[in-house]
Amino acid sequence: MATELLCLHRPISLTHKLFRNPLPKVIQATPLTLKLRCSVSTENVSFSETETETRRSANYEPNSWDYDYLLSSDTDESIEVHKDKAKKLEAEVRREINNEKAEFLTLLELIDNVQRLGLGYRFESDIRRALDRFVSSGGFDGVTKTSLHGTALSFRLLRQHGFEVSQEAFSGFKDQNGNFLENLKEDIKAILSLYEASFLALEGENILDEAKVFAISHLKELSEEKIGKELAEQVSHALELPLHRRTQRLEAVWSIEAYRKKEDANQVLLELAILDYNMIQSVYQRDLRETSRWWRRVGLATKLHFARDRLIESFYWAVGVAFEPQYSDCRNSVAKMFSFVTIIDDIYDVYGTLDELELFTDAVERWDVNAINDLPDYMKLCFLALYNTINEIAYDNLKDKGENILPYLTKAWADLCNAFLQEAKWLYNKSTPTFDDYFGNAWKSSSGPLQLIFAYFAVVQNIKKEEIENLQKYHDIISRPSHIFRLCNDLASASAEIARGETANSVSCYMRTKGISEELATESVMNLIDETWKKMNKEKLGGSLFAKPFVETAINLARQSHCTYHNGDAHTSPDELTRKRVLSVITEPILPFER
């Protein structure tokens, strides 16, 4: 009863009034909704008063989304209505990309706009053919002799699409002392292009490292008074996070709004971008309805009051990992797993005793439903929900693709729980591991490997034995995005974790291991992120063991990590900016195009 009274005093009405599209009527919270969100049923889950009093609490923010509202719309009809119009516009854009008479720089800028506006997935083969034509006809050599903007733009696009191009292309823009020419800074468009290209660097490419420093130093000196509002917005946007590290859907909505302000905007391209964005958003809404119904049916959020309920944030994360409309299965699978990860992480980090955590880890390793008999009640619910969900995913894969993936899914979960358990032991022992010991475990506890293994089986149609073997060994395409996931997470959450008494974090471990200040440790972690990106960039240059769709999915996980943790831990404590982003991607369509 005490728990119910405490929760009912919270301003519940806020969760129904904030962070969603405004409606012409006020939606009132029903008593049932209040009870589900704020109380723990003692009929099915029993905790003794002693246990409740001695358990830790992280005081996480409650869920602030209205599932009833999110589930209310029917979007399938709107998708069908716009398909024919989109096909006609797509055909017009395709003709422009395939125009062999177009000047190369004009073609490159068209491709760049297509990708920024979120349309790249529609024109993958066309873009590849255009770039093949550009390279085979000597276009790259010609562009590098004319302008820095053309050189940087073509370099970035070619590397994005797996072409091997040398950093030496930028040597012609340096003086006899090896410094970039000072007069280049007068061309802001060129400096922006150089800045974006520098983030496609590989290990040891010093020219690109120097290019990044040069570009950043000059871009930071610019002011709106000097370059105008439109260009200043582009510079600010780029400096916040480079294009190569941005999530596709957020970049699309930003680029559409920026592009529609241009006087020379390609109106056909703009109309297609808006139409496509809204159509894909309708697919997301359909996916979210399915995932939300599953989450409500599972009911963990209403039973485990100590844990974070982050289904919407998890689905938003999944959109960042696999945005293309055809990957609904991947989005639903990743969203479900991240929702489970969030709750189980709270069991290990906050609520469970060490003995209980060892029992839960053993149950996951055994993957035997009878193991629930050894678990406390709150863990029984969690384990059985996890057990049923993963078995269902494995069954669907066996039915649709003829492959038994259950051993790979359960191993991924066992590895994750063992990583969680190790962190719990450090916490209970109040010990701070060395950075190497910590990080060797922490990139696995990020849940990146688990998410990517589930994503692999959802994205890849023809499952190959060699790929599965490398997945189990946590191939670089699994580990490196997970490294970035962990490092970004740790940068965002270090202060809160230290306040809770958790001593294992990349920053704190680096401070202790190297004997340096928090400021220097933070800088070192940021440098590690940059170096990891250089290693990961190599996967885009062809020759990867894995097919391009999965490589992009894995890299997208790193991008979503930047998005989620760039301004704090937006998964644990979603702020208004995060909620606006979620709405813009999932529920708020872009205003229609007007000629």
Swiss-Prot record:
Boundaries of the annotated transit peptide in chain numbering: 1-37
Any one GO CC term of the record: chloroplast
Record family assignment: Belongs to the terpene synthase family. Tpsb subfamily.
EC numbers for this chain: 4.2.3.27
Keyword check for Cell membrane: no
Binding site for Mg(2+) 3: 489, 493, 497
Entry domain remark: The Asp-Asp-Xaa-Xaa-Asp/Glu (DDXXD/E) motif is important for the catalytic activity, presumably through binding to Mg(2+).
UniProt main location, coarse: plastid
Binding site for Mg(2+) 2: 345, 349
Protein keywords: Chloroplast, Lyase, Magnesium, Metal-binding, Plastid, Transit peptide
Biological role stated in the UniProt entry: Lyase that catalyzes the formation of isoprene from dimethylallyl diphosphate.
Gene name for this UniProt entry: ISPS
Primary enzyme class: lyase
A molecular-function term among this protein's GO annotations: magnesium ion binding
Subcellular location: Plastid, Chloroplast
Residues involved in dimethylallyl diphosphate binding: 345, 423, 486, 489
Motif DDXXD motif: positions: 345-349
InterPro entries: Isoprenoid_synthase_dom_sf (IPR008949), Terpene_cyclase_plant_C1 (IPR044814), Terpene_synth_N (IPR001906), Terpene_synth_N_sf (IPR036965), Terpene_synthase-like (IPR050148), Terpene_synthase_metal-bd (IPR005630), Terpenoid_cyclase/PrenylTrfase (IPR008930)
Residues that coordinate or bind Mg(2+) 1: 345, 349
Catalytic activity: dimethylallyl diphosphate = isoprene + diphosphate
Protein name: Isoprene synthase, chloroplastic
Upper lineage: Eukaryota, Viridiplantae, Streptophyta, Embryophyta, Tracheophyta
Keyword Plastid: yes
GO biological process, one term: diterpenoid biosynthetic process
Binding note for cofactor: Binds 3 Mg(2+) or Mn(2+) ions per subunit.
Names of the cofactor(s): Mg(2+); Mn(2+)
